[in-house]
Amino acid sequence: MSLFDRLKNKFKKAVKTLDKSVKIEDVINQAIVSSAMKSALNLWGQMYENKAYWLHEPTLEDPSRVTSLGLPAFVASEKARTVTLEMKSEVTAPSGNDEPTTNERASFINAQYQKHVISNIRKQLEYGIAKGGLVIKPYPIIDEDITKSQFAFDYIQADGFLPIAFDSSGRMTEAAFIQRKTDTKHVYTRLEHHKLEKNTVTITNRAFKSDIGQLKNLKNFSDLGREIPLTSVPEWEDIEPLQSVENVNRLLFAYFKMPQANTIDTYSPLGVSGYSRAVDLIKDADKQYSRLLWEFEGGELAIDVDRTAMTEQPYYNEDGILKTKLAMSSLQQRLFRTTSIDQSIGDTYNVFSPALRDVSLINGLNEILKRIEDVTALSRGTISDTNLDAKTATEIIASKQRSYDDNKDIQTALQKALEDVVYIMDVYCTLYNITPQGEYAVSFDWDDSIITDKDEETSRKLLLVDKGLMTKIDFTMWYYGMTRKQATAYLQEIEAEQLQAMQINMMNDLSV
């Protein structure tokens, strides 16, 4: 073989290699999402969107109709609501006393944190509860005037990223994110890979291109296509292919994970949906609810009328052929059903009005709803009828205890994720010199008024004040939400007014 032929063959092999479609397993380590977890994630998402596999309209093969009660979305929404109902969180400069202070770094981070995170956290937490986890990824938008730089935030649901590795404490140390855009002919994929090694995070960005006909499911992350330069896609041309950030102890995104144990894959470090243990019960509830609807529909009042007793009117069909039809309005068509009746009994109609079994069906549905409340840690009466349940204040509080404990667990997990968010913002502020260096502290206030009656708690704390076990300053801070400085000034003002009133009374007594 001549030198020219050898060079020609090498060139063909090189072109073939460049044109080869790449699998994600060829680019990064295998993701740790098992097939069981993938199936569960898909099911949780379908249930949340009211697209569960057991829901269907009547067909010739199966004339029954199974409709949704909307329980998955309600469970996720209600848990997110109760977790964040009284939530307060802010970033301030650390201080040696109870008075929050500020500096330029803390003030900037807090403004972005309040605007983009706290204002959206309830909705995003709902998605995290529904699918078992949520990624919050801050990234800076650098302006030529550095003082005008801001932060943007990506919220990635549990089925939108690929976790790869965790450390022994359960903290994620490697993951990949997929971003896709399409045109009329092609699908463009950006693979963003994050990896933490020692105290350095390495972020790698690569771009791929595939024909739109070859990728039917955009959520199928396995096939990436042919690798292309990032500059081939205008939206990605400014993204750095490789970036390393040193002196960090965590990845540059926050991962919220539902705190319950994983019963789908007991060896998986991933979180599970807030209704993962109620899937079969929710299925039963939907079917029972559909039986109840069918009971009402099938038991509707109807009158069976002999055909000879009904008036017919002529009409022409689409082919111009003369036909006849019953002369009835739409309401009459719903009420009257034509049939053949033995007129020897003397009547030309029969009334169809069966007794409904609604009470037994409703009671059965209510029992299922109670079980769903139990396994999803919702307080009794959230979705069930509580007519026969707890009545006294003590019993009501006891019924809420399970929900309260679960909320506290979720709050702890959410607080950890939000602390990571602020840490990452601080890292970027230093990396890009957005603000001068400055220390910060993140505070959280989770009010427990969901389980504790405010009047009862006030009476209890006042008793502690009377017994000398709680100071007036601490009580005033709790009751009015004041700082120690504000509470001290407030009490001093009250004492001054009381002293002035006492002096006036004494002067009045002396003048008598």
Model-found features: residue ranges?
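Ser/Thr- (and often Asn-) enriched beta-sheet segments in non-cytosolic proteins
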Residues: T200-T202, A302-D304, S443
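C-terminal helix-loop subdomains that flank or include functional centers
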Residues: E318-D347, F352, L356-V512
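Extended, helix-rich architectural segments
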Residues: M1-H186
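Short secondary-structure junctions and interdomain/linker hinges
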Residues: A14, L18, Y48, K115-N120, ...
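Flexible coil/linker segments and helix-coil junctions enriched in charged and small residues
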Residues: T92-T102, L215, T311-K325
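Extended, regular secondary-structure scaffolds
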Residues: E126-A130, V135-G274
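Short amphipathic alpha-helical segments
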Residues: T101-R105, Q112-Y113, V117-I121, R277, ...
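Extended, charged amphipathic alpha-helical segments
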Residues: T231-E395
